[in-house]
């Protein structure tokens, strides 16, 4: 009886710490740097430091502006002001790496 209890404990511990137990289906594996809503207000250009463009793994294309205070703000890349700000902040496109 004691042997079977020990074996059961070992089996449960092995299952709990198995990396496959932590795996998630790809459908649920959404990168944390995706935008699901866009800022409804135009941001002051003077507050911005940089930007990145979300990856193709995100459900919608977006621009993430980073402020000088470290805040991240999602914006719609189709908006004219967003395109102008991207040009002003740098000609090189900044894309997030997956």
From Swiss-Prot:
PANTHER family reported in the protein's UniProt record: C-C MOTIF CHEMOKINE 13, SMALL INDUCIBLE CYTOKINE A
CDD domains reported in the protein's UniProt record: Chemokine_CC (cd00272)
Pfam families in UniProt: IL8 (PF00048)
Gene3D superfamilies (alphabetical): 2.40.50.40
Cell compartments where the protein resides: Secreted
Protein name according to UniProt: C-C motif chemokine 13
Record PTM text: One major form (form long), and two minor forms (short chain and medium chain) are produced by differential signal peptide cleavage. The medium chain is about 30-fold less active than the long chain.
GO molecular function terms listed in the Swiss-Prot or TrEMBL record: CCR chemokine receptor binding; chemokine activity; signaling receptor binding
Disulfide bond sites: 34-58, 35-74
Note from the entry: This protein can bind heparin.
Annotated signal sequence range: 1-16
Similarity section: Belongs to the intercrine beta (chemokine CC) family.
Function: Chemotactic factor that attracts monocytes, lymphocytes, basophils and eosinophils, but not neutrophils. Signals through CCR2B and CCR3 receptors. Plays a role in the accumulation of leukocytes at both sides of allergic and non-allergic inflammation. May be involved in the recruitment of monocytes into the arterial wall during the disease process of atherosclerosis. May play a role in the monocyte attraction in tissues chronically exposed to exogenous pathogens.
Induction: By IL1/interleukin-1 and TNF.
Species whose genome carries this gene: Homo sapiens (Human)
Keywords: Chemotaxis, Cytokine, Disulfide bond, Inflammatory response, Pyrrolidone carboxylic acid, Secreted, Signal
Tissue: Widely expressed. Found in small intestine, thymus, colon, lung, trachea, stomach and lymph node. Low levels seen in the pulmonary artery smooth muscle cells.
């Amino acid at each position: 009886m004691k042997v079977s209890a020990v074996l059961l404990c070992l089996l449960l511990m092995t299952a709990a710490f198995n990396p496959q137990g932590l795996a998630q289906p790809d459908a649920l594996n959404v990168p944390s740097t995706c935008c699901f809503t866009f800022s409804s207000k135009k941001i002051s250009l003077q507050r911005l430091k940089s930007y990145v463009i979300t990856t193709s793994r995100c459900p919608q294309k977006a621009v993430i502006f980073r402020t000088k205070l470290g805040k991240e703000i999602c914006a719609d890349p189709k908006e004219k002001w967003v395109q102008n700000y991207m040009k002003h902040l740098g000609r090189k496109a900044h894309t997030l790496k997956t």
